[in-house]
């Protein structure tokens, strides 16, 4: 397992674009006998993924918002250090919904795995998982938690630096009016000024931005604007 961590660390140092990094991650997973890999970045309630999991599973996971149900994500949020997991071995203590989740994942060759979660900036979390179709991961020795966190920390930095386009992410959208108003916010306009420029009532601007803030589950226009820019919605 330490050899795998070394390979991951070496990969993050290779020059190249996001495509090269994704290919390298897939090669590492395959070389060590795993079904696939998944990097998740979770900030507040927003989640993005860089993964080679089956397309249908990725779509189902995000459409159904499975991150709120996923026992691996729940454990990663609370544990913040490397751990192995198995849907079969954990079955007796799982809820009916969690068992159904693992059963669906198993249809795509995801039955067990190793996950390394780390804390990242501004209260966010990143986690890297290698998934297996085996019912459990055989570990001949304990995984070095420090080395694992260091490897995933470097991976997170590399993905952030390259601004890799996510393989999947939770749905995010703005209607035309919301996008227009946020573009004005982004260049420093107040809601009163936006109302004047767009020739609408102040209350129309306020209500539209409040609707968008509620949908994105944020509490300030600054946060909403930052998310919209990050998601390339404006």
From Swiss-Prot:
Say what the protein does: Positive regulation of conjugal transfer of Ti plasmids.
The organism named in the record is: Agrobacterium vitis (Rhizobium vitis)
The beginning of the lineage is: Bacteria, Pseudomonadati, Pseudomonadota, Alphaproteobacteria, Hyphomicrobiales
A Gene Ontology biological process noted in the UniProt record is: regulation of DNA-templated transcription
As one GO molecular function, the record gives: DNA binding
Q: Which InterPro entries match?
A: Sig_transdc_resp-reg_C-effctor, TF_LuxR_autoind-bd_dom, TF_LuxR_autoind-bd_dom_sf, Tscrpt_reg_LuxR_C, WH-like_DNA-bd_sf
Q: Which keywords accompany this UniProt record?
A: Activator, Conjugation, DNA-binding, Plasmid, Quorum sensing, Transcription, Transcription regulation
DNA-binding residues (ranges): 191-210
HTH luxR-type domain span: 167-232
Disulfide bond residue pairs: none
User: What protein does this entry describe?
Assistant: Transcriptional activator protein TraR
Does the entry feature the keyword Transcription regulation, yes or no? yes
The UniProt family comment states: Belongs to the autoinducer-regulated transcriptional regulatory protein family.
Residues annotated as coiled-coil are: none
